[in-house]
């Protein structure tokens, strides 16, 4: 690596507990991501890997260029690698005030693909990314990099959208899935100093009764179904909140009605939440994920950071 590489302190097999991979791109959002880390995992029980990817695709056809252009491209490549090394070293220095088990690694390849490969290879338990790239001109989540990360990551993804001012209030969307129960278990493992109050929300999606102009008998059946769904949602929210309270947390369960993503976002604004947690089941294709996922809606429009919990 030109200019030397990040120092890296621990081999993977020596690192304890939870394995966190944090993608660094030089933006203020990735700096905020570093500040979030001690609040989601005790540095004594976790290892941290900082990664930055340099896309080498633009340098693959150097042999086809004239000598002057080729030399300029080689110089650009060296500068890119040196800049990436400095970026990682700075991030490692910033994180070292809280963490002992840190490594930093420069990846080569398309950023999303390289980060996903690294997360799989390292068997990461959590991937942390900033919500905007370096340019700030558009949300990172509208681009292909973060789309691929959210779709293909082999672990939960924490999307940092705001600076860390203390993890005080969390909104958790409970739908009875394995992912939402595992998210609750994840919450109970947060460090002692990061024990926020939790609002567990079970959301009943709207039934299309009015739009279909159903006859009165069908409307009555629809109302009965809605009543059953509400009772089940109430049980689910109460059970989830009870699980957290048994673990020593301050938690309450509520039932909401409406589009789940929009309801969770509104609730987070009302509660002034620092974090929304939603589950995301595996999808067969990118189209399915991004054309209707509750997690996608929440990540795009939430007023706070979001943890997308994947099994």
Which residues make up each language-model segment?
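Short, structured interface segments
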Residues: 142-163
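Small/aliphatic-rich secondary-structure junction motif
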Residues: 8-71, 96, 100-102, 169-223, ...
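Short beta-strand elements of ligand-binding domains
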Residues: 130-131, 156-162, 306-310
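A short acidic, glycine-rich active-site loop
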Residues: 70-86, 220-235
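Structural beta-alpha unit
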Residues: 2-16, 29, 58, 71-78, ...
């Amino acid at each position: 690596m030109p200019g030397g590489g990040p120092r890296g302190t621990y081999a993977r097999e020596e690192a304890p507990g939870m394995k966190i991979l944090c993608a660094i791109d030089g933006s203020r959002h990735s700096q905020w991501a570093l500040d979030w880390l001690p609040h989601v995992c005790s540095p004594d029980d976790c290892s941290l890997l900082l990664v930055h990817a340099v896309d080498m695709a633009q340098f693959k056809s150097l042999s086809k260029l004239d000598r002057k252009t080729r030399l300029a491209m080689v110089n650009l490549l060296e500068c890119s690698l040196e800049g990436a090394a400095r970026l990682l070293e700075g991030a490692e220095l910033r994180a070292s005030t809280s963490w002992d088990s840190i490594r930093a690694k420069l990846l080569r390849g398309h950023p999303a693909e390289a980060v996903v490969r690294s997360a799989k290879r390292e068997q990461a338990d959590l991937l942390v990314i900033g919500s905007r790239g370096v340019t700030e001109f558009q949300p990172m989540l509208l681009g292909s990099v973060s789309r691929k990360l959210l779709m293909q990551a082999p672990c939960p993804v924490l999307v940092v959208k705001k600076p860390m001012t203390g993890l005080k209030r969390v909104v958790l969307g409970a739908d009875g899935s394995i992912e939402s129960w595992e998210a609750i278990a994840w919450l109970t493992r947060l460090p002692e100093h990061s024990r926020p109050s939790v609002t567990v929300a079970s959301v009943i999606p709207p039934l299309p009764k009015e739009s279909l102009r159903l006859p009165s008998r069908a409307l009555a059946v629809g109302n009965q179904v809605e009543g059953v769904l509400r009772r089940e949602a109430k049980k689910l929210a109460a059970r989830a909140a009870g699980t957290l309270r048994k673990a020593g947390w301050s938690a309450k369960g509520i039932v909401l009605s409406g589009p789940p993503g929009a309801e969770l976002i509104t609730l987070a604004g009302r509660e002034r939440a620092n974090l929304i947690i939603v589950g995301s089941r595996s999808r067969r294709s990118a189209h399915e994920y991004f054309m209707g996922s509750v997690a996608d809606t929440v990540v795009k429009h939430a007023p706070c950071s979001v943890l997308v919990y994947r099994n």
